[in-house]
Amino acid sequence: MLSRDMNIADFDPELSQAIAQETQRQEDHIELIASENYCSPRVLEAQGSQLTNKYAEGYPHKRYYGGCEYVDIAEDLAIERANQLFGSDYANVQPHSGSQANSAVFMALLDAGDTVLGMSLAHGGHLTHGAHVSFSGKTYNAVQYGIDEQTGKIDYDVVEALAVEHKPKMIIGGFSAYSGIVDWQRFREIADKVGAYLLVDMAHVAGLVAAGLYPNPLPHAHVVTTTTHKTLAGPRGGLILSACGDEAIYKKLNSSVFPGNQGGPLCHVIAAKAVAFKEALQPDFKAYQQQVLLNAKAMVSVMQERGYDIVSGGTDNHLFLLDLISKDITGKDADAALGRANITVNKNSVPNDPRSPFVTSGLRIGSPAITRRGFKEEQAKQVATWICDVIDNIEDEAVIERVKGEVLTLCGKFPVYA
């Protein structure tokens, strides 16, 4: 018999301490990694439930195991809410991650060696959009597009020219470090011109899409993938959506997720996804996403006033890239210095970066997490000021310590979990 009095602290104090330290780190640090966010206690409750004990290979009402009647309810709820949230008529909530979701789409619609056209990792794309170190670049013939050096925006004429030249079987729209608005309709027109599938990876902007603050790719893409964390603020996981109405594609996608890419689904995570989707359907979720945009723009305005270069000249979503080439400071060094000031960012390559991906010349900065803990424009501007102060005085530990103290004071006023 398992006693409910069992706890980690008594049994495994070393691990318990690590968990406690990470919990405190999240409270005491300003989180600006664009792909991170904070789950609600409701999501955490679902993810820590007894649903983790259940094996449920297959799909609701078509399982290979018995005893699935209640996890079927949870998965049905997640599917229904995902479709309601995004306007899709197909949803697969089983992918363990965004990369798994993308892998499943590739396997469903392509054969090994087929040509795909996606955004270059160096210009803001994702590993799974054709990077040579990923399955997407190893298994498939990957052709890459980038952004215009002058505007920092996607040049759709260049994308079209590449599509006409290489005749890809699938074109990928989406990004992991691009601050503009993507024209999904233009992507679909290009895909139709060459007879390609259009896959949109909206992992970074799914929350904004759900709130109606960023163009919804569902009316244009054959298939859409996303993560369920980031701007959606749910558990870590993946999601595949479609509104193309093609049942043959839906069947291929389901078979590609299970048994093609995964075995049993994570029932506790699916339940947590269902909770997160319900949260995203509430009116206050749109207000949150509106503030995410306002905070990102507020930070950009301060940094531009301080003489910093922003890739593409600004932001229209939750993130932006800080280009440090003119400062002759590496992203790695800036990341480390800010970390000592309790400000968490991630080093990131900028277009035509002369430095390696392990060093970089830029930082990627996002506003979802600080907004989640209650920051408004005033606090966002203060954070941007601190970032500039630290980078401008990157070897001055007195400045870094001063900023750290001020960060701790602000974090104390805006706890993540009150």
From Swiss-Prot:
Cofactor(s) essential for the protein: pyridoxal 5'-phosphate
Organism of derivation: Pseudoalteromonas atlantica (strain T6c / ATCC BAA-1087)
Gene: glyA
Keyword Cell wall biogenesis/degradation: no
Entry's Gene Ontology molecular function annotations: glycine hydroxymethyltransferase activity; pyridoxal phosphate binding
Enzyme class: transferase
Record localization: Cytoplasm
Top-rank lineage group of the source organism: Bacteria
GO cellular component: cytosol
This protein's UniProt keywords: Amino-acid biosynthesis, Cytoplasm, One-carbon metabolism, Pyridoxal phosphate, Transferase
BP GO terms, sorted: glycine biosynthetic process from serine; tetrahydrofolate interconversion
Binding, (6S)-5,6,7,8-tetrahydrofolate: L121, G125, H126, L127, S356, P357, F358
InterPro entries assigned: PyrdxlP-dep_Trfase (IPR015424), PyrdxlP-dep_Trfase_major (IPR015421), PyrdxlP-dep_Trfase_small (IPR015422), Ser_HO-MeTrfase (IPR001085), Ser_HO-MeTrfase-like (IPR049943), Ser_HO-MeTrfase_PLP_BS (IPR019798), SHMT-like_dom (IPR039429)
Family: Belongs to the SHMT family.
Pathway: One-carbon metabolism; tetrahydrofolate interconversion; Amino-acid biosynthesis; glycine biosynthesis; glycine from L-serine: step 1/1
Subunit structure: Homodimer.
EC number(s) recorded for this UniProt protein: 2.1.2.1
Protein name, entry field: Serine hydroxymethyltransferase
CDD domains found in the cross-reference section: SHMT
N6-(pyridoxal phosphate)lysine: modified positions: K230
Residues flagged as site, Plays an important role in substrate specificity: H229
Role noted for this protein: Catalyzes the reversible interconversion of serine and glycine with tetrahydrofolate (THF) serving as the one-carbon carrier. This reaction serves as the major source of one-carbon groups required for the biosynthesis of purines, thymidylate, methionine, and other important biomolecules. Also exhibits THF-independent aldolase activity toward beta-hydroxyamino acids, producing glycine and aldehydes, via a retro-aldol mechanism.
